[in-house]
């Protein structure tokens, strides 16, 4: 069963955006979360699909990052849940193949943390521009 991990202590005032990051593996989540937080994002970390579903029901996010330790089925379902909670939420799937209608961008997580961060920055900027119009 999934559980919600402690939230980042970063102030929302300096945040680049609020992201929900979901993985099944806590160590992987901790490592990648540090990269996102270091870039100025407020990160809500959740472990497993049940915790992510709960988070989508109770919160709104600029982006959702679905990690590579989730199963293909979990990533597939959670992408829909992210969009159901808010059409404006950008969905980034790590280590995915193929195109899913609810996924805004998919990237091979083996590309490295900096490339993942670059894509996340692009997605959050796109959301900000779309909301400004």
What are the roles of these predicted feature ranges?
Residues 15-26, 32-36, 64:
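Conserved acidic segment of CheY-like receiver
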Residues 45-63:
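Acidic, metal-coordinating helix/loop segments flanking the phosphotransfer/catalytic sites
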Residues 48-52, 74, 115:
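Short acidic active-site motifs
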Residues 1-24, 100, 111-133:
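Non-catalytic signal-transmission and effector/linker regions of two-component phosphorelay proteins
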Residues 79-82, 88-99, 107:
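A short, hydrophobic beta-strand element within the central beta-sheet of small alpha/beta folds
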């Amino acid at each position: 069963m999934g559980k919600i991990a402690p939230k980042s202590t970063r102030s929302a005032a300096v945040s680049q955006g609020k992201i929900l990051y979901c993985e099944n593996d806590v160590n992987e989540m901790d490592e990648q979360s540090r990269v996102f937080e270091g870039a100025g994002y407020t990160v809500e970390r959740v472990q497993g699909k049940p915790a992510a579903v709960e988070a989508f029901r109770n919160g709104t996010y600029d982006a959702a990052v679905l990690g590579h330790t989730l199963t293909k089925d979990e990533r597939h379902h959670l992408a829909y849940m992210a969009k159901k909670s808010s059409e404006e939420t950008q969905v980034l799937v790590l280590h995915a193949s193929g195109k899913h209608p609810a996924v805004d961008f998919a990237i091979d997580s083996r590309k490295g943390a900096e490339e993942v961060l670059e894509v996340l920055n692009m997605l959050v900027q796109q959301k900000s521009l779309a909301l400004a119009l």
